[in-house]
């Protein structure tokens, strides 16, 4: 096989053409071309020979194996048990905003564990159904979920705001930018809570410790770390799957004599509101994932010195951002977001001729064309790095060698240029990661990096079940114990043996890059189920074994069609490289398919659920 360099030479003309198109699109504020814009059914005669793609795939595998050689597959190289000497990394810097209160021993109709978009969306739908008794139990000091916790400099959403921010039709709000910043999103979350009167019964600074089904009263007993013992007819797990900060297991974390924190617990008291206190500080940040990509440009501008410790680079694409045109906003008619969402679900119209070509392809050819288009997109990202980053060695280190979507793709216009600054140093650990921290700071490959501030951009624990407390259902069975032999749900929302319990954002549900689309659909479904129970004098509903098994098999039938996740470099999308059961993942049909299943299940409630009446 030819070397990558030789193959890339033959690829140069094609890459230049793509790059020029991308720049033109960016100038016109149009969405840049990416892998999802490629039609893999086209002949692709202007693409490189197949041997080029095969060699790139070999390189991807080499990079994956290199990283797995440094650590075991799975999450053992991280810890989310932030207690003892690590407790400070989980402390809420805004906890002073929580008022003291007496323990609660009351009852509500609907109780949410978590106060992010899952709870806000579903509560809005429940209000529309006339449900008045709604309580949000949130460990933070306010609603907002991830946008409450993540307030690091530069934080913003990487999904178009007109799609990501939910309930725009209902609130009449129009985002200020194409991509909304974190502060705007957080304020919008509070606006939703006010609009739907969700603060009245909410409790903050409170962590649920157990949720137990009382078979005699057929209600859930919810206990918290504040001494509460509340009862609820319906409980909705809305705590999110990326809400618990984690740290890499690095020897000596506790030895560091300087200041340190996790990105999701940003200490503005130390850095200053505008990072002005960092002007004379040497700063290190460990991690180059989505949070780091947004924070690093701001740190680069403010810090005296910045060391960026990288294990695996993120893919960085163009961020086509702009302020919302007020004239365009004034033309929006009621229902505009719902129509926009429906168009996205329906997808583009595919000509019959293209459908016919796709239908005639073998599975192997389809996979190959998809992979080749994916590699085309990644090589364009590589070319952009070469164009932006001045130092050739740094540019090579910043190139991601994996398929797009192996890791969360990032979009930023200032991240790559940050490495052209004289005060910024990239410390590429080449897949190994930082292994030691001393009193002075990180130490890698025999080099001691003396710093004043150490920031951990090491991400969050991925909770497969969508729950964090002990949920005890019928017959005293802990939900986590039930899942030991594989996750079992209906739609990723219901689990047999746990009546009136709903799980949001967990596995076996559909996954979309715009997560709020999924949460909105789940919220509508949950509100419909609760409304059905209330209107039909049903006290509790629980999915049947048959319905649950049918959904598990549906999930399995859509998994394992490719080896993409297995072939990826370790990351939270593939359980850090660990082998996982075929049912322990997302539903890989389409969003439209998922909604169709939801609708069908609601149309046949008596076939899919067991009811009790009191």
Regions found by a protein language model. Name each.
Residues 100-107, 111-112, 117-143, 150, ...:
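Rossmann-like dinucleotide-binding core of oxidoreductases
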